[in-house]
Structures are given as structure tokens and as C-alpha cells.
């Protein structure tokens, strides 16, 4: 999971060396290009969690840790983190089942958690009110019956976009979502994939990496491309490639620059490189 507050990016939990699941947090200073040493958090170790910054605070939770058939492996805890004081506060638990691989975005007051997995692929969309600490479910009639997990999305100039993911096969759908929960179909992403990542600049959304599932655990393709989406023209273009193909990368935006990196290579080894993208 990753988010940005001020001039810093924060990377929380995930998978580390020797396939270990982590609960710590690293802080990246975008101005000095320096990573601070890891710090402890009150979070349970997890992968495929969800994080979203609203103003000077971040909201973090959900994810997975444990056995695929254990109820307690699907995490629904939800936390508020204040970087200025380095304090954590436990909030109302997430009431949905789509706790693994959900994507979050904000309108500045509310956080919307979209899709995910929890004993099945979900098409649910839940809204969290940061002022009242209350969760509500968005009416499903406002969006398509398009269920998925491990999708990607970002907000560009106040408009949110979401797509790709997995539901028994890799997906390349791409939608614009307004803050009433209405979905509008946009041009498909080149290359069906899941476990990609997005980060936005002032004009574009960049989508990087991911995997196309080929039908078996050993078949398929890892992506090294960086795709650029232009909301004004609803068009995709190839922006470049990273030196390595990867899944489960992280992404965040600081001062109009997109940062994308880390993740896992095809041999399931963790990667430590972070890339800066400017329009």
C-alpha cells in the first residue's frame, strides 16, 4: 500500500524478503530523494491492502494475511494515520466482504472502496465518511455488474478512473466513476492485466506493470510497460518501459510528479527501485 501526504510518500505493509509479510512503514522524501528507516505501525502484517490520503491524513486497512480458506485471513480493520504527529487511530471496521485487492479514491471528504475479493469477486462499492466514521454501500444499479479484484485506478483533475483486474481471467476494462457512483465506460487498457498500479500527474494517468494470467500458475506474462492515459481525449499511449517487469508495484503523486516502483518480479523477488514520472 502507498499514499502521499505533503512532500512525502509512504509505503505500508506488503511482502518483503523471503516472502515475509510485513507490517512496517517506510517514508520517502521526494525533495531530497531519501528513504527514512522503517518504522513500526499498529497494523497486522498484510498484503493487498488499501490506502488513501485525505488532506493531511491517511486512511489504511483491509487486505489479506493467512490461509486462503480462513475467515480471519480477510482483514477488515480501518485506521487513520496523521503524519504530522505520527499517530494512529482505529476506526469503524469495513463492513463489506471485498477486503482483498480493493481500490480506493476520494472526493476530499469521503473515501470510496471499489471491487476486491472476499470469498468471491466483488462488484461492490462502499463509501466511508471521514467526518462521521460511517460506512455506506453505494447503490449497485449505478454501475455495471463488473466484478474484479487487483484492479488499478487514479484521480486526475477531479475525475476518477478505474479498471483492469482479475475475475477468472485478466481484464482490461476502463471506467470513469463520478462521486455519485455512476460509471461511464472508457477506452480499454492495452493489454489485459491484474496487479498493475496507477499514479496521476496534472494531465495524465500512468499505469504500470501487472500480469496477464495465462490459465495456469506458471503461464502468463509480466508487463514492464508504462501506459499513459489522457482523460481529455480518452486515449492510451505507450510512455515507456521499466528495466524490469513486475506486479504489485506501488504508486503515489507528490507535487504533480508520479512515482511508481517496488513490486515483485516473475521469480517473486521483491524489487526496491522507485521511478519518477513527469509529463
Q: Across the structure, where does each feature detected by a protein language model lie?
A:
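Kelch-like beta-propeller repeat domains
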Residues: 1-279
Amino acid at each position: 500500500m502507498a499514499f502521499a501526504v505533503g512532500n512525502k510518500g509512504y509505503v505500508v505493509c506488503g511482502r518483503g524478503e523471503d516472502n515475509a509479510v510485513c507490517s512496517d512503514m517506510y517514508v520517502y522524501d521526494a525533495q531530497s530523494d531519501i528513504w527514512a528507516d522503517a518504522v513500526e505501525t499498529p497494523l497486522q502484517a498484510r498484503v493487498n491492502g488499501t490506502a488513501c490520503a485525505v488532506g493531511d491524513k491517511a486512511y489504511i486497512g483491509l487486505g489479506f494475511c493467512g490461509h486462503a480458506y480462513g475467515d480471519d485471513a480477510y482483514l477488515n480493520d480501518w485506521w487513520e494515520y496523521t503524519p504530522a504527529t505520527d499517530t494512529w487511530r482505529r476506526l469503524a471496521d469495513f463492513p463489506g466482504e471485498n477486503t482483498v485487492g480493493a481500490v480506493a479514491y476520494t472526493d476530499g471528504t469521503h473515501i470510496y472502496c471499489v471491487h476486491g475479493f472476499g470469498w468471491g469477486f466483488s462488484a461492490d462499492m462502499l463509501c466511508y465518511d471521514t467526518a462521521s466514521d460511517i460506512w455506506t454501500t453505494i447503490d449497485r444499479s449505478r454501475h455495471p455488474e463488473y466484478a474484479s479484484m487487483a484492479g488499478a485506478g487514479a484521480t486526475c483533475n477531479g475525475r476518477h478512473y478505474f479498471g483492469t483486474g482479475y475475475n477468472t481471467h485478466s481484464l482490461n476494462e476502463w471506467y470513469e466513476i463520478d462521486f455519485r457512483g455512476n460509471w461511464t465506460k472508457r477506452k480499454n487498457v492495452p493489454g489485459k492485466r491484474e496487479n498493475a498500479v496507477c499514479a496521476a500527474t496534472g494531465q495524465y494517468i500512468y499505469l504500470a506493470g501487472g500480469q496477464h494470467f495465462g490459465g495456469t500458475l506458471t503461464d502468463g506474462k509480466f508487463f514492464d510497460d508504462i501506459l499513459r492515459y489522457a482523460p481529455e481525449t480518452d486515449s492510451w499511449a505507450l510512455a515507456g518501459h521499466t528495466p524490469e517487469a513486475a506486479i504489485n508495484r506501488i504508486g503515489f503523486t507528490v507535487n504533480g510528479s508520479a512515482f511508481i516502483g517496488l513490486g515483485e518480479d516473475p521469480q517473486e523477488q521483491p524489487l526496491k527501485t522507485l521511478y519518477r514520472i513527469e509529463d
